[in-house]
């Protein structure tokens, strides 16, 4: 598998873990550590998929997803929401904000890889 992934995550242990494992599988990984930087990186890098933490500094994940889906240059990029707050209704809230899929933390890496593959395939 290959493709470009934008990982918007503010916790170093999570972005370090995910970026290393994704790179080993042939993905190019672009990092952003807050929502505002995530929007800027999405516009600059035009990734195939965005992994978006919902609990971010500066601009939270919900607002980031809405901003990405409102902009013509990023609206078609699939977004997979990542959240530790796997509460009832969070999946619906993420989808309503513009996310295309949802993955609760802790990360189930094989499942996340399947979701990434599906998202990239849907974008073709």
Pin down the residues of each PLM region.
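Active-site beta3 strand of CheY-like receiver
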Residues: 45-51, 56
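Charged docking surfaces used in two-component/phosphorelay signaling
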Residues: 16-24
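C-terminal output helix
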Residues: 107-116
């Amino acid at each position: 598998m290959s493709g470009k992934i934008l990982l918007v995550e503010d916790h170093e242990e999570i972005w370090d873990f995910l970026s290393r494992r994704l790179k080993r599988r042939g993905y190019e990984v672009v990092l952003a550590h807050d929502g505002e930087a995530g929007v800027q990186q999405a516009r600059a890098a035009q990734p195939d998929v965005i992994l978006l933490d919902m609990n971010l500094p500066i601009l939270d994940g919900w607002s980031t997803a809405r901003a990405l889906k409102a902009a013509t240059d990023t609206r078609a990029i699939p977004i997979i929401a990542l959240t530790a707050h796997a509460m009832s209704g969070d999946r619906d809230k993420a989808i309503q904000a513009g996310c295309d899929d949802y993955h609760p933390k802790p990360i189930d890496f094989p499942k996340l890889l399947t979701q990434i593959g599906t998202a990239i395939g849907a974008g073709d």
